[in-house]
């Protein structure tokens, strides 16, 4: 089968791919040399590179209810090109898509920013239950959304929101939505460029909610798609090449993550914004995805008193670098110190309906204040 990779309605690459295998064999047939600058910034234009890029345009294996979702659509993880044929590789991250050669669809008619989503697929993605859906086009962002937790995109009042549940199955699970909601308040108090989060209950599940921060003008690209090896040192070097604005944003993230004890900052949940009309990186992306922060997995014994909580906190480490406080102290600037001062008397604003227990919330609040004092060398 022959396919065409497009940005908007501009054809960029024509390729053939075998469809009867989990590892399609790719052959590049044609490239648009005049528009080479508009190829995805994370695409290496070789058969293997295109294969890697295409894998990112299908639902990940660790996504909640992935097998139920695909089965109801007559699809299978072992046939990725069949998934792409149905969802056209459309994403809410950017304006690239993949169509079968000869398909006359236009981006205006199928893109996920402007056109309705399938509510049936949203419910399937979130609950694992629903009716079978068999059609030549499945208009849904669920096929290109990453992450393990149950989640789905919903269009409400003309805006697009991500609804995301928490972990399940044990006494210390399910707190991720609270962490998203409260961490966003800390970011706001500091003046950190981060996405606001709300709380809502949908399908009987407590969810964090946030508005989509991409559109047809600006795309999001995770830093892990641009820097594939070398760890945080390589990321910093990449940011330094892009300028002070990016370095400052990286440092701000490290300080913020130290305050909230974010144990799940990884190379997929921070990155850059790309101007879709020029295909150039224009700014750091806002921070998001803070569910694994503010001691969300601490068991009941850790909340007995401050000493028990601090003993638990001592066991927490960042995902991709050495330690929270030491790393943050090393990048502190006068501007970041000023942001931390806003936390010295920080108080959470309670949600009107959904909140952590009062004792737990106040203990988290005191730890936020204390971690700010430690970073400011007041302790």
Question: Which residues does each PLM region occupy?
Answer:
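Phosphate/dinucleotide-binding and metal-coordinating scaffold of catalytic cores
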Residues: 1-255, 259-261, 273-379
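Conserved protein-kinase catalytic-loop segment immediately C-terminal to the catalytic Asp
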Residues: 266, 271-273
């Amino acid at each position: 089968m022959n396919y065409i990779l497009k940005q908007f309605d501009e054809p960029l690459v024509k390729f053939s791919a075998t469809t009867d295998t989990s590892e399609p064999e790719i052959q590049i047939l044609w490239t648009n040399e005049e528009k080479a600058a508009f190829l995805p910034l994370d695409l290496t234009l070789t058969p293997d590179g295109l294969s890697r890029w295409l894998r990112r345009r299908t639902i990940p294996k660790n996504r909640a209810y992935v097998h139920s979702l695909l089965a109801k659509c007559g699809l299978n993880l072992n046939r990725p090109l069949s998934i792409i044929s149905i969802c056209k590789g459309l994403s809410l991250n950017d304006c690239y898509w993949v169509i079968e050669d000869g398909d006359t669809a236009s981006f205006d008619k199928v893109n996920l920013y402007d056109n309705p989503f399938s509510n049936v697929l949203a419910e399937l993605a979130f609950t694992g239950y629903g009716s079978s859906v068999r059609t030549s086009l499945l208009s849904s962002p669920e096929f290109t959304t990453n992450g393990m937790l149950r989640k789905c995109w919903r269009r409400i009042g003309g805006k697009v929101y991500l609804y995301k549940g928490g972990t399940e199955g044990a006494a210390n699970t399910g707190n991720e939505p609270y962490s998203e909601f409260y961490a966003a308040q800390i970011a706001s108090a500091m003046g950190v460029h981060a996405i606001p989060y709300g709380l809502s209950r949908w399908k009987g599940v407590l969810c964090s909610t946030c508005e989509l921060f991409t559109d047809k003008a600006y795309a999001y690209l995770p830093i892990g798609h641009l820097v594939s090896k070398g760890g945080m040192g390589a990321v910093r070097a990449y940011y330094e090449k892009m300028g002070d604005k990016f370095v400052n944003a990286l440092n701000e993230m490290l300080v913020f993550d130290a305050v909230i004890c974010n144990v799940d900052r990884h190379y997929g949940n921070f990155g850059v914004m790309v101007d879709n009309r020029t295909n150039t990186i224009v700014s750091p992306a806002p921070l998001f995805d803070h569910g694994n922060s503010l001691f969300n997995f601490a068991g009941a014994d850790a909340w007995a008193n401050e000493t028990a909580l601090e003993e638990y906190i001592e066991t927490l480490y960042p995902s991709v670098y050495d330690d929270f406080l030491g790393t943050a102290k090393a990048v502190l600037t006068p501007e970041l110190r000023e942001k931390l001062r806003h936390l010295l008397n920080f108080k959470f604003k309670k949600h009107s309906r959904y909140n952590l227990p009062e004792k737990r919330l106040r203990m988290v609040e005191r730890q936020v204040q204390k971690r700010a004092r430690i970073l400011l060398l007041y302790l």
